[in-house]
A protein has these predicted regions:
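Short beta-strand segments
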Residues: 56-58, 185-186, 211, 240
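Catalytic core of nucleotide-sugar-dependent glycosyltransferases
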Residues: 140-141, 145-148, 153-179
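Phosphate-bearing ligand-interacting subdomains
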Residues: 214-271
Length: 271
C-alpha cells in the first residue's frame, strides 16, 4: 500500500504508476470488483500484439441501492458491444478505466496521466492513439463496476461535456486536422454550432453542413440534405448528432451515399 498526502486523482495515479516495476500495470477502483480471468485475458492480448498500449474489456454494473441509472447502463452496453475502439474513439471513452491493463513503457513514452480540466483516462487513450499506439477490449467480462451518485464522473467538471470535447479537438488537431482540410459537418443546430465555430476558427474550410432541417445557410455555410453527400468534394466528415440511435442510422446511410468514407479514418462520430 502506498501513502501520500491528498493531491487529487491524477497525482495518485501518477504516484502509483511510477512506483510500479512490472511490464504491465492493471487499474482497478477500490470499490469495483476484478472478475476471475481478467489478467489472463488482458496479458495474453498484450503479449500477442506489441503495438497494443492498453487493453480493457467488458463489464457489468451494479449499485448498492436501487436500479442502475439508464445513462450509465447505456454506456456500459456500448462498451460491451464495441468492435473497434479506434473507429468510435471520438464518441466516448472506448475503454473503461477500472477495466484497463496497460503497457508501462508506452504510457511512460507519452508522459503518463496529465492533470488539468480533462478526463484523465480519455485523455490518455487519445494521446496513445494519436502517437501511433493501439488500444483494444478483450471479449470477456473483466470487471464489475459499482455505480453511485458520488462518482467523479458525475460531480467533477473534468468529466463535463466541454472537457470531453476539448479532448476530442486536441486529438483531431494532432491527427486528421493537422493541416487545413475540406470538412463536411453532419449536425443539428444545437450539437453542431460549437463544432462549426471551432472548425472555422482553426482555419478549416467547412464546405457544407448536413442536416434534415430546412435551413439554407448556417454561419455562412450552406445547409444540405444527406442526399447531397455524393456530390461533395471533402476530406473529412464529422458527425455531431447525439440522438439515441442516430449514429447507426447515419452509418448505414453513409455506406450507401459515400462508401469511400471509412469510419475512424476520414469520418468520425463525435457523439
Amino acid at each position: 500500500t502506498l501513502h501520500q498526502t491528498k493531491k487529487g486523482l491524477v497525482a495518485a495515479l501518477e504516484h502509483g504508476r511510477r512506483e510500479c516495476r512490472g511490464q504491465y500495470i492493471a487499474r482497478l477502483d477500490a470499490d469495483d470488483i476484478a472478475l476471475p480471468g481478467r489478467l489472463d485475458h488482458q496479458i495474453a492480448a498484450l503479449d500477442t500484439d506489441p503495438s497494443l498500449a492498453a487493453v480493457g474489456g467488458r463489464a457489468t454494473l451494479f449499485t448498492d441501492h436501487g436500479p442502475v441509472p439508464r445513462g450509465m447502463q447505456y454506456y456500459i452496453d456500448w462498451i460491451n458491444n464495441l468492435d473497434d475502439p479506434h473507429r468510435e474513439i471520438l464518441v466516448e471513452s472506448p475503454l473503461l478505466h477500472p477495466a484497463v491493463t496497460f503497457r508501462a513503457t508506452h504510457v511512460e513514452h507519452i508522459g503518463g496521466y496529465r492533470s488539468g480540466e480533462v478526463p484523465e483516462d480519455y485523455d490518455l487513450w487519445l494521446r496513445l492513439v494519436a502517437d501511433g499506439f493501439r488500444i483494444a477490449n478483450v471479449a470477456h467480462e473483466v470487471v464489475s463496476i459499482r455505480d453511485h451518485s458520488s462518482r467523479l464522473t458525475r460531480t467533477d467538471s473534468r468529466y463535463s461535456r466541454t472537457a470531453f470535447d476539448s479532448c476530442r479537438r486536441n486529438f483531431l488537431q494532432k491527427t486528421a486536422l493537422l493541416r487545413p482540410r475540406r470538412i463536411v459537418l453532419w449536425a443539428g443546430v444545437r450539437g453542431g454550432r460549437p463544432w462549426l465555430r471551432w472548425l472555422k476558427t482553426g482555419g478549416h474550410q467547412v464546405i457544407a453542413v448536413i442536416d434534415i432541417t430546412k435551413s439554407i445557410v448556417r454561419s455562412g455555410v450552406p445547409v444540405l440534405p444527406p442526399a447531397a453527400l455524393p456530390d461533395l468534394d471533402l476530406d473529412i466528415l464529422l458527425v455531431a448528432v447525439g440522438a439515441r440511435g442516430a449514429r447507426g442510422q447515419i452509418r448505414n446511410e453513409l455506406a450507401t451515399l459515400r462508401p469511400d468514407l471509412v469510419e475512424g479514418h476520414n469520418w468520425w462520430a463525435l457523439l
